[in-house]
Amino acid sequence: MAAISPANATTAASLSLPQFSSTSSSLSSSSSPSFLNFKTASVSNRCIKCGVRSLENHSGHRSLDFLSNGDPISLINPNSSSPITMAAATSESGSKSSKRVCLFHSDETRDLAERIVAKSDCIELRSINWKKFDDGFPNLFIQNAQGIRGQHVAFLASFSSPAVIFEQLSVIYALPKLFVSSFTLVLPFFPTGTSERMEDEGDVATAFTLARILSNIPTSRGGPTSLVTFDIHALQERFYFGDTILPCFESGIPLLKSRLQSLPDSDNISIAFPDDGAWKRFHKQLQHYPTIVCNKVRMGDKRIVRIKEGDAEGRHVVIVDDLVQSGGTLIECQKVLAAHGAAKISAYVTHGIFPRSSWKRFKLDTKGDPAEGLSYFWITDSCGMTVKEVMNKPPFEVLSLAGSIASALQV
């Protein structure tokens, strides 16, 4: 600590001491520290104790924390291990760790992209012109392409049908070549995930084909492309991707857990898995709930669902799976659980595909009969077309992946 007495005021002034106003004393009672900049001034006979908050230069001035009136003036140089210095360093490093991301999107994912941007000030929405030539092939234009040089760039894709995959792949392959700092592909639903089996000679595993295509996305200046996807169908599919892409596998289960905790009967919930595959995938994330496991058995030409283990009697049973298409398995599981005494039945899937509007098969339980309807059917917004169809149609509720994606873009 270096003390400066009033006798050395002239010398102190040459060191650019702060000039305090008559209201300086009120600053000491503020809950947050006040910052004063050094400037050449005469100290006169006034003695004030100050503490140096930071020794960094800001536009030629040094910043202080005002401490108190006192005698004499003291300039305190905090060492690197002091709490104030460490807190300042932590705050500065925290702000520097948040990266700004330019987010592009397909036509189908505009609504989800806007929700993602609303979740983070560090994500900026960018646009692409999606047009077609007269022959039907895509006519694409990335707006302000030079403006994304050196930026972190992400693309929110939706491979909802083979018709849109080619035009989006064209953009996905082009963006990393625009001198971007890094490139992240967000594909909430990996669409060919159910096509990974080769049971007969001649079967084509299209899941592996798409994984190979994505593995060959050009590298950006920062290195390989990052891929963010949610609840991919078969666990072994994570090994389909090559070494030139960095897959980040996320899950929608945390959204479900948060929603279940908000229910009035949250202490009476059991989780049912429609088959062993769903149990292997999700049981560790939901292990604090009582578990019911169903399976399919063949009876002649039919396959029926039975309860393998667990008790549904008097419980609010939530059927959990990664995706639903026609919904036949879920409906059979619902009937079996109701027959075993479930008080309520709800369902959750991360990806509600529902081809040919099969979502209409699921009705709301309005009479207290779980065999006839569901209390809730939760899906995420990974499939944008489905969300538009089921929005505000009970028993469906949409749990948005926007917050999870915004967090993943900061990895």
Swiss-Prot record:
Entries under Pfam families matching the protein: Pribosyltran, Pribosyltran_N
User: Which residues does Mg(2+) bind?
Assistant: D231, H233
Q: Which CDD domains match?
A: PRTases_typeI
Keywords, A to Z, come to: ATP-binding, Chloroplast, Kinase, Magnesium, Metal-binding, Nucleotide biosynthesis, Nucleotide-binding, Plastid, Transferase, Transit peptide
Where in the cell is the protein located? Answer: Plastid, Chloroplast
Transit peptide residue numbers: 1-39
Q: Which InterPro entries match?
A: Pribosyltran_N, PRibTrfase_dom, PRTase-like, Rib-P_diPkinase
The EC number(s) given in the record are: 2.7.6.1
Q: GO biological process: what's one of them?
A: nucleotide biosynthetic process
Q: Name one GO molecular function term.
A: ATP binding
Which residue stretches belong to region Binding of phosphoribosylpyrophosphate? 314-329
Q: Which residues form the signal peptide?
A: none
Cellular component per GO, a single term: chloroplast
Reactions it catalyzes: D-ribose 5-phosphate + ATP = 5-phospho-alpha-D-ribose 1-diphosphate + AMP + H(+)
The family database entries (PANTHER family) matched by this protein are listed as: RIBOSE-PHOSPHATE DIPHOSPHOKINASE FAMILY MEMBER, RIBOSE-PHOSPHATE PYROPHOSPHOKINASE 3, CHLOROPLASTIC
Please give the family membership noted in the entry: Belongs to the ribose-phosphate pyrophosphokinase family.
Q: What is this protein called?
A: Ribose-phosphate pyrophosphokinase 3, chloroplastic
User: What gene is it encoded by?
Assistant: PRS3
